[in-house]
Amino acid sequence: MTAALAAIGGKWKLIILYWLAESPKHFAALQRAMPGISQKVLTQQLRELMSDGIVNRDPKGVVPAPVVYSLSEYGRSVLPLVENVRLWGRTHLAVRADKDR
């Protein structure tokens, strides 16, 4: 459990994985998809995910060099967990809404 949380825990990593599961993305597209994340934090989170082999960084061979981030094959193995967390979150919101009524 500790190793899993170290690799994909925190406020932003699962959200990054969610958006990359949809399709590879440029840095700016990821940042737009996640209001509230700073450039510094997104950079740090992507570096950690790359270091763990979960995300690939693919610089294109033009100048200025646009970089595309994508899930690695290993990173795709996390997608069932990402989907389960997403579904649990929807259920949790519904339970809280019912409780507040």
Each PLM stretch: what is its role?
Residues 3, 32, 44, 80-83, ...:
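Generic recognition of well-ordered alpha-helical segments
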Residues 18, 70-101:
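Amphipathic alpha-helical dimerization/coiled-coil segments
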Residues 24, 34, 46, 75, ...:
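Short amphipathic alpha-helical/adjacent loop interface patches that line ligand
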Residues 42, 46-49:
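Basic amphipathic alpha-helical segments that dock to polyanions
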